[in-house]
Every structure is written in C-alpha cells, then in structure tokens.
C-alpha cells in the first residue's frame, strides 16, 4: 500500500489518485537563466524517482514539467548578457536537458514554456478580477490575498500577519511579509523596447512567476491534479500562491498531494557564491560520472538534507561500483552458464521473491530510495554468493532479471550491457580459466596479455573472472 508524505497535511497518507490507476504529476522545472546547480538537479531527480517508482508499482503516470522562460531573473540576466530573451533562455534550456541526460532522468510527457501560455494567464487574471480576488493597479494585476481565507494553508502562514491592501512586485519575498502579489506586471519602457510584452485588457504586460505554473498545470490536467513536486524553497511564496490562484478561480482543490525535496548543502553550509561552494552538475559529473551522482542522490531520502562533500561522493562511488561489478559478473557468467544443478540453486531462487517484496515495500513507504538501495545491496550479496560456485542458467537468468529490474527502477546502469564482450575475448577468458584450474600460470599470463591487447582487462575474483574494457578500470 503506497503511502506518501503530503506537505499540505504534514502527514504520511495512503495515496489514492483522482482517477484509479492513473496519476497526474506537475513538476516545477527550471528557471532558465543560468547553469542549474546540483541542488536543482536533486529536486529534478526526486521527481524522476517518484515517476519511476509509480510506474514500477503499476500506475500509468503522466508527468508535465514547466520551463520558466520569462520572469524577473531571465529578463534581468538576458539584458546583462546582451541577448534577446528567447536566445538567452533557449541556451539555458538546452543546458538543462543535457543535465537530465547526464543523470539518466526520464523525459516528461511535456515541457510547456511560460511564454507559450500567456493567453491563459491573461484569462485566469480576468476570471480572478471577476470574482473579486484580483485588481488592477498602475497597469499591473494583483491577487487580493485577503479574499482567499485559506491563504497560507500550505506554508502554515499566520493569516493575521497579512498586510491588507499592500502589494509586492518582485517574484520572491519573505514569508513574514505576505502581500498581494503580482499576477501580471506592467511592462517597463525598457522591456517594451526589448519586445518583452503582451497586449492585455490592462495594457502591455508580462506574466508574474506564480501565475505561470497555475495555468500550465491546469492546462495540462484540469482543475485538480494528483501530485505537485518541487523544492522546499518553493513552498512559500510560489506554491502557496499557486493554490490561491487556482482554487480561487475554480473553487476546487488544486493539488491532492504536495511533495517537496529538501535542500542540498555543502559540508554543512548552504550553497552561496560568496562561499564559493556552488557546484554545477557538469562539474560534479566530470569528476564522478553521472550515475555516481544519481546514486549519491538516491542514498539520502528526499525529505532529508543531503550534505555534499568529497568524502560522501567517494563513498557513493565505491558503493555504486560494487553494485556495477556484480552486474558485470552476472552478465559474464551467463555466457558460460549450463543446465547442471548446484548446491545454492534452491536457496538463491527462494531468496528472490522476498527481496522484491522488500524492495517494493521500500518504495511504497514514501519513495524510500535509501532503503531500496539496501535491498539492492542484499541482492548483490546473494548474487555474489551464488556466483562463487553456481552457474545454472535458469538461476542466473532469474537473478539477472531481478537485478536489472531494481537497477531500471532506480535509473542505474543504463549503459551496462549495451556493448557486448566480443566472442574472441570471451573464448580467451574461458581458455585462461581452464589453464588456471590446471595451475598453468604461464599460459594464464599469456592469455591475460592477449586479452589486454584486445582492449580488455581481467580481474580474478572468488566468484569468477570479471572482464572490463580497459578504460573502465
């Protein structure tokens, strides 16, 4: 039974989708004004983990992630770069997708851009004005938060602190100073000169940040969606304002379950440019590899802060490589498998269903990937114990199938097995194993060298030889 922690209720709840068997997810995507740092990608990976787990659990899932390509930051920084807003945001949108590929993050069903949905934003603002929940002032349109009594229910804001009639134009502001926020902003003369404006009943405007997500989410799924994901930093004001806009307009619940990922910190401190501890994803991937970074993120529950350090990353790398080595051993051993019976056959086959049950329960418990990795390591141990003496084809195939199922759900080892070990190398390894059993060490060394000249290395382990391409060592 799937249980998910809901930020709205601050409780772990039994999850029930709006439509049985189908799940809608809207994820706050990147604001494309710079290279996203590793903390941003931790949140994107959290959404990917939720998607993969739900699919494994048998749901049909539709994920939509937005691209914020017009807001205060994109306008400011595109000007500083001397680029048009579109050219500037296209550049960083491309970088965002490169990062997804580095981490083997599955593509969403759609990536709507804010600039493609402005008509819907103008319509939502008009509807809110009609309901008395918004008003025009100096060419901008503001949301009247005093008109929505439930304002603050997500962030647990004290409604008594609301400043009646006070408004704020910036997209991000403090929880202790809640004000009427801008739905649509009057374009400045400079923005109009740069072509950053849209015609509306209130003049030339451009959208505020918060209305963008309300419109793109409801355009994708209607008034109510199952899950909305994002980082904890978005709870206020962004997600709070999404609720006010959407529910104020429709009178229906906007999101059933809110899922928020905690911060990534660096050696106990918040990332900041002044401390020179802000790392982009390419920097970390170049050092450790994309799958190691993914493994590192998986090893800490999404609702806990991840404290990044080189020691932590090295530990993740070592654990990842141990699991990868087991997969390599399994796939190599399958080439030499037979139909004989071995002492560990029944015990190994008996262990597999229980391990999958444990793996499933881990994911059903609020997408607990650290616990799922613990089960994965136990499967690795079971596989290695069997490989020490057994090579029954049926057993190896079942172990390998479950191993691959776990790795696919966790998004690991995507490239493993795509390049087959050449038949010539496999034959030489078999000949070398035969020589080793006869203690013919001279022939064994000669064959090792032949294997090396073909671009592969061999490592002798108690569970059998491990063959890798030379550059992987």
From Swiss-Prot:
Cofactor note: Binds 1 zinc ion per subunit.
SUPFAM superfamilies hit by this protein: Anticodon-binding domain of a subclass of class I aminoacyl-tRNA synthetases, Nucleotidylyl transferase
Keywords noted in UniProt: Aminoacyl-tRNA synthetase, ATP-binding, Cytoplasm, Ligase, Metal-binding, Nucleotide-binding, Protein biosynthesis, Zinc
One GO cellular component term: cytoplasm
Residues annotated as signal peptide: none
Catalytic reaction equation(s): tRNA(Cys) + L-cysteine + ATP = L-cysteinyl-tRNA(Cys) + AMP + diphosphate
Cell location: Cytoplasm
Gene Ontology terms, MF aspect: ATP binding; cysteine-tRNA ligase activity; zinc ion binding
Enzyme Commission numbers on file: 6.1.1.16
Any single GO BP term: cysteinyl-tRNA aminoacylation
Residue interval(s) of motif 'KMSKS' region: 270-274
Motif ('HIGH' region): 30-40
Amino-acid positions noted as binding Zn(2+) in the UniProt annotation, renumbered to this chain: 28, 213, 238, 242
PANTHER family: CYSTEINE--TRNA LIGASE, CYTOPLASMIC, CYSTEINYL-TRNA SYNTHETASE
HAMAP family: Cys_tRNA_synth
NCBIfam families: cysS
Family, as annotated: Belongs to the class-I aminoacyl-tRNA synthetase family.
Name of the protein described by the UniProt record: Cysteine--tRNA ligase
Organism this protein belongs to: Methanosarcina acetivorans (strain ATCC 35395 / DSM 2834 / JCM 12185 / C2A)
Gene name in the database record: cysS
């Amino acid at each position: 039974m799937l249980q998910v922690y809901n930020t709205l209720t601050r409780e772990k709840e039994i999850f029930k989708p709006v439509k049985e068997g189908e799940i809608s997810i809207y994820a706050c995507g990147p604001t494309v004004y710079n290279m996203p740092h590793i903390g941003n990608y931790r949140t994107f990976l959290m959404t990917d983990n939720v998607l993969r787990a739900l699919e494994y659990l048998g749901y049909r899932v539709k994920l939509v992630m937005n691209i914020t390509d017009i807001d205060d930051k994109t306008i400011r920084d595109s000007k500083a770069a001397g680029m048009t807003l579109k050219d500037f945001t296209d550049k960083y949108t491309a970088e965002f997708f490169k990062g997804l590929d580095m981490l083997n993050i599955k593509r969403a069903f759609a990536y709507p851009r804010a600039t493609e949905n402005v008509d819907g934003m103008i319509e939502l603002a008009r509807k809110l004005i009609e309901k008395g929940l918004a008003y025009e002032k100096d060419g901008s349109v503001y949301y009247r938060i005093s008109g929505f009594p439930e304002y603050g229910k997500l962030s647990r804001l004290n409604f008594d602190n609301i400043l009646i009639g006070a408004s704020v134009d910036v997209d991000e502001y403090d929880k202790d100073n809640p004000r009427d926020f801008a739905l649509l902003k009057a374009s400045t003369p400079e923005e109009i000169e740069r072509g950053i404006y849209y015609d509306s009943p209130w003049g030339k405007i451009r959208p505020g940040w918060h209305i963008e997500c309300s419109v793109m989410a409801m355009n994708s799924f209607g008034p109510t969606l199952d899950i909305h994901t994002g980082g904890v930093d978005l709870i206020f004001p962004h997600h709070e304002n999404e609720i006010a806009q959407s529910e104020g307009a429709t009178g229906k619940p906007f999101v059933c379950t809110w899922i928020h990922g905690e911060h990534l910190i660096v050696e106990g401190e918040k990332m900041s440019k002044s401390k020179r501890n802000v790392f982009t994803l390419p920097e970390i991937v170049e050092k450790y590899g994309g799958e190691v970074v993914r493994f590192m993120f998986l090893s800490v529950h999404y609702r806990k802060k991840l404290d990044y350090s080189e020691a932590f990353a090295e530990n993740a790398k070592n654990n990842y490589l141990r699991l990868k080595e087991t997969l390599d051993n399994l796939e190599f051993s399958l080439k030499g498998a037979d139909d004989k019976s071995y002492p560990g056959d029944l015990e190994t086959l008996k262990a597999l269903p229980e391990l999958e049950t444990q793996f499933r329960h881990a994911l059903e418990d609020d997408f607990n990937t650290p616990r799922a990795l613990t089960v994965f390591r136990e499967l690795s141990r079971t596989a290695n114990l069997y490989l020490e003496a057994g090579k029954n084809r049926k057993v190896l195939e079942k172990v390998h199938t479950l191993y691959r199922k776990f790795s696919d759900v966790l998004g690991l080892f995507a490239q493993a097995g795509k390049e087959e070990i050449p038949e010539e190398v496999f034959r030489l390894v078999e000949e070398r194993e035969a020589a080793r059993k006869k203690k013919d060490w001279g022939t064994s060394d000669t064959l090792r060298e032949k294997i090396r000249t073909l671009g592969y290395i061999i490592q002798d382990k108690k569970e059998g030889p491990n063959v890798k391409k030379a550059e992987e060592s």
